[in-house]
Swiss-Prot record:
One of its GO terms (cellular component) is bacterial nucleoid. This is Nucleoid-associated protein A1G_07310. NCBIfam families: DNA_YbaB_EbfC. One of its GO terms (molecular function) is DNA binding. Keywords: Cytoplasm, DNA-binding. Binds to DNA and alters its conformation. May be involved in regulation of gene expression, nucleoid organization and DNA protection. Homodimer. It is found in: Cytoplasm, Nucleoid. Gene3D superfamilies: Nucleoid-associated protein YbaB-like domain. Belongs to the YbaB/EbfC family. It holds the Pfam family YbaB_DNA_bd. Its main location: cytoplasm.
Length: 107
């Protein structure tokens, strides 16, 4: 039979690791690039866009559609990095257990 006190200590330890991982993710920054670096998006671990950098060569009316696409690609690239880091950080906090694909933490 499993010792209840030992189980409780493990649960508390896991909870502490989860809180630490959440804080680490909330403070992290992820850079997504598109068009060979012509567009760069910096997003927080919460998925909020912090900064968008656009090369001046794209600031022409005839480049509008391409610019919109590059911003989308750069943001998605930053979001993918955030999601991967989140999975890895939380897996460590959960002693190697993997979260289901697409699972999002509430932060």
């Amino acid at each position: 039979m499993v010792n209840f006190n030992q189980f409780l200590k493990q649960a508390q330890s896991m909870q502490k690791k989860m809180q630490e991982a959440q804080e680490q993710m909330a403070n992290a920054r992820y850079t997504g690039k598109a068009g060979g670096g012509l567009v760069e998006v910096i997003a927080t671990g919460k998925g909020e866009v912090e900064k968008i950098s656009i090369d001046e060569s794209l600031l022409k009316a005839e480049e509008k559609e391409m610019l919109e696409d590059l911003i989308k690609v750069a943001f998605n690239n930053a979001q993918q990095k955030c999601d991967e880091d989140s999975q890895n950080s939380l897996s460590g906090a959960l002693n190697g257990m993997r979260l289901p694909p697409g699972f999002k933490m509430p932060f």
